[in-house]
């Protein structure tokens, strides 16, 4: 990172509570990192984001930075507010603080051809503050933010969210929906909308590890209600009861408001079970990839109706992990029953039984089932919507 100024005009501005210095839990952060890593040559991109407090010394809010990646690509970054997106106990919504920061530093924002946004409320504000065409990204199912298991404030105003999102979609230059079912509805509002699966970053994925543990289960996600980390603990407890002779273990990666609750749940288990569960907290993507390389099976316990196209499932399968998922969480239909994993009800005993079956599945078949979902290919397709003239968009 060096202090620098972007050109007077850039091709694209990305707006989100994003900090290149520290990854945050969730698919949006990973999406933005993938886009920045695989930018086409010659595309100038600036990011209006936040300072999480973990950057290199010398950073100042309101001061531009130039970030150069190992592959030679670069982008500009302007932190406009100080906040940690992973802190879900905030009193003031993160999106509001981000917009207030953009308002404060709007004179420093360059001209642009398109503004990329990942939230409906941010999109509404950006239309006023920046006044440029929108590239709107939707990461959830139709009622993903407003359903009963959502942790979004919009669950209290579902009708308003639906109307406002329709307003944004109709006026966007491009719309990318990471959920195939919802994309069909969105395309009725804006014919330019496309469906895109999420992707894995081939530079992060580790094919195999000499230390891969046949009995290690991995769970990755935010410790929030939609992801239901408590169910993972309950499932593991049942697994140990069903198969006490095998050295099963569970690594849980992530953080959130339920972390202490989960810790208490673990501590309440019998000691010989609790000692096999590790709560690893918030770790960078490289460490998540290493954990996937060392594990044997991936467990996903999200509630039905929330996930758009779960990126962590794509990443785990690209790492060769058979996956056991709760019904409704694999919205991309990636899990081929008995071949690449298993779909289960939310009953801990059924989840546990399918975990025992998953360790015998062929890792190469799992890995090969998602090879088409690599970041370089899908990022290029998405950016082509706004930055090249296309006669057709395949797979839409």
Model-derived features: positions:
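A conserved mid-protein helix/loop that constitutes part of the nucleotide-sugar donor-binding site
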Residues: 30-34, 215, 222-241, 257-260, ...
């Amino acid at each position: 990172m060096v202090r620098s100024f972007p050109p007077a005009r850039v091709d694209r501005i990305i707006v989100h509570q994003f900090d290149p210095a520290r990854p945050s839990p969730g698919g949006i952060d990973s999406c933005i990192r993938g886009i920045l890593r695989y930018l086409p040559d010659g595309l100038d991109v600036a990011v209006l984001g936040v300072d999480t407090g973990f950057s290199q010394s010398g950073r100042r809010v309101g001061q531009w930075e130039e970030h150069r990646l190992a592959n030679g690509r670069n982008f500009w970054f302007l932190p406009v507010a100080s906040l940690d997106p992973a802190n879900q106990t905030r009193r003031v919504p993160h999106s509001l603080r981000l917009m207030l920061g953009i308002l404060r530093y709007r004179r420093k924002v360059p001209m642009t051809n398109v503004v990329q946004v990942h939230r409906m409320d941010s999109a509404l504000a950006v239309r006023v503050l920046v006044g440029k065409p929108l590239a709107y990204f939707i990461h959830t199912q139709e009622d993903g933010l407003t359903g009963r298991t959502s942790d979004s404030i919009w669950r209290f105003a579902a009708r308003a969210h639906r109307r406002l999102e329709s307003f944004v979609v109709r006026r966007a230059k491009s719309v990318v929906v990471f959920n195939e079912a919802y994309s069909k509805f969105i395309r009725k509002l804006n014919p330019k909308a496309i469906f895109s699966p999420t992707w894995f970053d081939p530079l992060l994925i580790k094919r195999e590890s000499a230390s891969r543990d046949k009995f290690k289960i991995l769970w990755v996600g935010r410790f929030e209600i939609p992801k239901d980390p408590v169910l993972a603990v309950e499932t593991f407890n049942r697994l140990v009861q069903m198969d006490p002779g095998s050295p099963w273990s569970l690594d849980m990666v992530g953080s959130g408001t339920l972390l202490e609750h989960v810790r208490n749940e673990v501590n309440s288990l019998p000691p010989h079970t609790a000692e096999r569960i590790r709560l690893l907290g918030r770790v960078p993507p490289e460490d998540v990839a290493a954990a996937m390389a060392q594990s044997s099976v991936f467990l996903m316990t999200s509630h039905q109706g929330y996930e758009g196209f779960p990126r962590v499932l794509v990443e785990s399968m690209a790492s060769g992990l058979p996956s056991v998922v709760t019904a409704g969480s694999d919205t991309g239909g990636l899990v081929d029953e008995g071949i690449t994993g298993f779909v289960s009800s939310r009953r801990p005993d059924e989840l546990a039984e399918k975990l025992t079956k998953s360790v015998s599945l062929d890792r190469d078949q799992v890995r090969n089932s998602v090879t088409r979902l690599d970041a370089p290919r899908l990022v290029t397709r998405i950016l082509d919507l706004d930055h090249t003239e296309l006669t057709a968009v395949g797979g839409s």
